[in-house]
């Protein structure tokens, strides 16, 4: 056991986690030169295209150190994006240490801090590594100072490497062996294995990635899942080297996979404990805290026949993504679908893209909303995440919106722009600290503002240099109202949104004008209105297409023309009473992109 090292690789987006992982695999001979693909561990198409890591992946490597001993390194490549921070905390629960990778050109960024604090809270040893020293703008000495100054861990003698060229990779491996402690656990004790991740394979059933904390799990053992109490037989156990490799057993301290032919999707929930069916452990291991979705949106299949396959797809995804929450929803405009909870906008985009790609579904998304706390006049408190579930205005005593604490790191020349943006988003500044060239800003912002387009605008006002991370702090009373869009006097439920009172006029006008552009002209006039309660605050009309009915009259009496025009007018009036308007798909998406 003293030759096992379990560690995660944590870093901000684009600081080179996945490339470093590739390099470590290559160095330890996990794959031949021919099999080395860039970003070996990013196996999803979306991950490769966007160049981001979404799912944490694990790899087991053998490394012959300078002291002549062979060490088993189990490492987990983690995502860097703020939306996937729960993936990071799950991966850390399976390790004893973490490599904090920092780009020697960019320096410390917000996510570096957030992930590092997560690791320190779990009492882990954090080993800083300066990556990308081959870049012309790399300044490792300045960055090492920055790490000590902002993060507060020793970094003067941090390893310097370049994952791209392979310089200093040996040193990284040596540091891992020297500085990260071996796992602790009782090899003789009853089996306790923590499920770090599980996913569904259509041939093998549920594949679970586990970390053995105590005891040994052999192939053919009968084990039970502690939360459900169901028994299964381990058909195959093994490790990823990154290829699936079967082994006869998994020993204490190791990280590997178990396949037990579990066919139902929630048979092995993430964060659960496995133990032997007979003489098993009595206590489960402490799991992970459940992540609460922050953003909700309705997803509807374009053709109603896809509803069943949409539900199956969601079930399969939710096995692999513990943070996904969904419930059925119906909309008069869009039919049957699901209300889905996400961790953030990137998460929402990724899930929608995975559903469309991996399960061939065509989906419509409604505008994302956050959860509001509402105190009704009868004294009870309810939580609403869907604008159409909002009680009538006269039943609402008080509406409270979620406030997030946002930590922003930004170079000082862009500070003014960022402050202007935060003020525009109704933010309250709580802290501002200078660290050399960087400024750390802390703002309390309404989550609804952060969710919509804050990230993109922050990046554009700071030319991409600012970085942020946020967490929910509390609900706070706010003047929020529901803005409805009426088309020909009918409310379209999928276009409703909850917004701040100060923005009603501008938002209402913008929406109405956008709808006017997007809804095709009909044979009769269409009124598009924005309303709050029964008060109309903006309106525009989509003019009817009209046929020139008097074209065939040449000369003759004017009463002839009048008769034809009157006949047309009556027809249009009748049409308007019975006609209904199809709202095109683009109109629903327009709500999301109002600020562009």
UniProtKB/Swiss-Prot annotation:
GO terms for biological process: positive regulation of translation. It is a peripheral membrane protein. It is an enzyme of class 3 (hydrolase). CDD domains: EF4_II (cd03699), EF4_III (cd16260), LepA (cd01890), lepA_C (cd03709). It comes from the Bacteria. PROSITE patterns: G_TR_1, G_TR_2. One of its GO terms (cellular component) is plasma membrane. One of its GO terms (molecular function) is GTPase activity. It is found in: Cell inner membrane. It catalyses: GTP + H2O = GDP + phosphate + H(+). Residues 2-184 form the tr-type G domain. Its EC number is 3.6.5.n1. Keywords: Cell inner membrane, Cell membrane, GTP-binding, Hydrolase, Membrane, Nucleotide-binding, Protein biosynthesis. GTP binds at residues 14-19, 131-134. It holds the Pfam family GTP_EFTU_D2. The keyword Ligase does not apply. Belongs to the TRAFAC class translation factor GTPase superfamily. Classic translation factor GTPase family. LepA subfamily. Required for accurate and efficient protein synthesis under certain stress conditions. May act as a fidelity factor of the translation reaction, by catalyzing a one-codon backward translocation of tRNAs on improperly translocated ribosomes. Back-translocation proceeds from a post-translocation (POST) complex to a pre-translocation (PRE) complex, thus giving elongation factor G a second chance to translocate the tRNAs correctly. Binds to ribosomes in a GTP-dependent manner. This is Elongation factor 4. It comes from Shewanella piezotolerans (strain WP3 / JCM 13877). The gene is lepA.
């Amino acid at each position: 056991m003293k030759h096992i090292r379990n560690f995660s690789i944590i870093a901000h987006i684009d600081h080179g986690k996945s490339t470093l992982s590739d390099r470590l695999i290559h160095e330890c001979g996990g794959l031949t030169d021919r099999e080395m693909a860039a970003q070996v561990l990013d196996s999803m198409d979306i991950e490769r295209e966007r160049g981001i890591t979404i799912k944490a992946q694990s790899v087991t490597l053998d490394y012959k150190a300078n002291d002549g001993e062979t060490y088993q390194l189990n490492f987990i490549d983690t995502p860097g994006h703020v939306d996937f921070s729960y993936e990071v905390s799950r991966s850390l629960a399976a390790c004893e240490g973490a490599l904090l990778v920092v780009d020697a050109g960019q320096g410390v960024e917000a996510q570096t801090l957030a992930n590092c604090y997560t690791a320190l809270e779990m009492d882990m040893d954090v080993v800083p590594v300066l990556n990308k020293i081959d870049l012309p703008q790399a300044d490792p000495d300045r960055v090492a100072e920055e790490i000590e100054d902002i993060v507060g861990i020793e970094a003067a003698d941090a390893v310097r490497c370049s994952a791209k060229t392979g310089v200093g990779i040996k040193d990284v491996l040596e540091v891992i062996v020297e500085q990260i402690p071996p796992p602790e656990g009782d090899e003789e004790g009853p089996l306790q294995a923590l499920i770090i991740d599980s996913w569904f394979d259509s041939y093998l059933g549920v594949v679970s990635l586990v970390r053995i904390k105590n005891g040994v799990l052999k192939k053919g053992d009968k084990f039970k899942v502690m939360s459900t109490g169901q028994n299964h037989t381990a058909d195959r156990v093994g490790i990823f080297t990154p290829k699936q490799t079967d082994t006869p057993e998994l020993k204490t301290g190791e990280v590997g996979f178990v396949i037990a032919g579990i066919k139902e999707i929630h048979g092995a929930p993430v964060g659960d404990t496995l133990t032997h069916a007979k003489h098993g452990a009595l206590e489960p291991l402490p799991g992970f805290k459940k992540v609460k979705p922050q953003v909700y949106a309705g997803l509807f299949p374009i053709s109603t026949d896809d509803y069943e396959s949409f539900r199956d797809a969601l079930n399969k995804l939710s096995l692999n993504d513990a943070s996904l929450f969904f419930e059925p929803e119906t909309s008069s405009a869009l039919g049957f679908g699901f209300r889905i909870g996400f961790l953030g906008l990137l998460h929402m985009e990724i899930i929608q893209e995975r559903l469309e790609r991996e399960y061939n579904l065509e989906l419509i998304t409604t505008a994302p909303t956050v959860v509001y706390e509402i105190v009704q006049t009868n004294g009870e408190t309810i939580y609403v995440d869907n604008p159409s579930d909002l009680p009538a205005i006269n039943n609402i005593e008080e509406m409270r919106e979620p406030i997030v604490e946002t930590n922003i790191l930004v170079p000082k020349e862009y500070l003014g722009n960022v402050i202007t943006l935060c003020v525009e988003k109704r933010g309250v500044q709580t802290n501002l600290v200078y660290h050399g060239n960087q400024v750390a800003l802390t703002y309390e912002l309404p989550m609804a503002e952060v969710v919509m387009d804050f990230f993109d605008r922050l990046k554009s006002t700071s030319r991409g240099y600012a970085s942020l991370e946020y967490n929910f702090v509390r609900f706070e009373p706010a003047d929020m109202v529901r803005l409805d869009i009426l088309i020909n006097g009918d409310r379209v439920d999928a276009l409703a949104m909850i917004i701040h009172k100060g923005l009603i006029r501008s938002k209402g006008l913008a929406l109405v004008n956008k709808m006017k552009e997007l809804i095709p002209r009909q044979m009769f006039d269409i009124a598009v209105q924005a309303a709050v309660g029964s008060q109309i605050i903006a309106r525009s009309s989509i003019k009817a297409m009209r046929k020139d009915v008097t074209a065939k009259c040449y000369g003759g009496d004017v009463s002839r023309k009048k008769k034809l025009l009157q006949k047309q007018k009556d027809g249009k009036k009748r049409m308007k009473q019975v006609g209904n308007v199809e709202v095109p798909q683009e109109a629903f998406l327009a709500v999301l992109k109002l600020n562009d």
